[in-house]
Design a protein with these regions (language model features):
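A short, structure-level motif marking secondary-structure boundaries and short turns
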Residues: 28-30, 54, 85, 128-131, ...
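Short, basic, helix/turn surface patches
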Residues: 2, 8-11, 41-48, 83-90, ...
Length: 191
């Protein structure tokens, strides 16, 4: 990860998304992982300062909102924040609105999406909540956007379609285009 700051700098990035783990593939307890991450992220803060680039840990099907908050509070630097993925907290059994209430002031980047239950997928699989265009799922995207604005977020709103719901009968490009239109409409309504 430390070498990636140089790449981000070459691109002119001011925020770099990072992923810490993935609960699906990790069998070890989270306590030791969290302690290692805190130490690694403290080192990363020094590199981030040198480059003037903040890094944003995504809730990538790995850590709960409380665990992420624990990391942020332990590292205690403006150079570390969150990439808030609107759907990934649901996939861990958490409410994204409650997660936003805890983490909103730390959001440096976003993955905006909407989800629908995929009845054909095994319930324990992450894709049992499959992506649909924004506005066609069950996530309270308008409320999450309002919470982001109220927290002072001024960064990008990146649409992410990760695993299309089988009932959506268009391709990913169509889902992204539809999502962008809806996201623009929702953002205009925040003014």
């Amino acid at each position: 990860m430390l070498d990636s700051f140089g790449h981000a700098d070459l691109l002119g990035a001011k925020v770099m998304r990072v992923v810490s783990s993935n609960r699906i593939y990790r069998g070890e307890p989270h306590g030791p992982q969290l302690e290692r991450l805190k130490a690694q992220y403290r080192q990363a803060v020094d590199v981030a300062k040198r480059y003037g680039i903040r890094f944003a840990v995504e809730n990538h099907l790995d850590y709960s909102a409380d665990e992420l908050l624990e990391i942020l509070e332990a590292v205690d630097s403006p150079y570390i924040g969150i990439t808030f993925d609107f759907g990934n907290f649901v996939r861990l059994g958490e409410d994204p609105v409650e997660a936003m209430a805890k983490l909103g002031k730390f959001v440096y980047a976003t993955h905006v999406k909407d989800l629908r239950v995929n009845e054909d997928a095994p319930q324990e699989e992450w894709y049992s909540y499959s992506a649909v265009p924004i506005g066609e799922g069950f996530l309270d995207v308008p409320r999450l956007l309002r919470m982001l604005k109220d927290a002072g977020y001024t960064g990008l709103l990146a649409v992410e379609i990760d695993c299309l719901h089988p009932a959506y009968h268009h391709d990913e490009d169509a889902a992204v285009a539809q999502s962008v239109r809806e996201l623009k409409r929702l953002v205009q309504g925040l003014s």
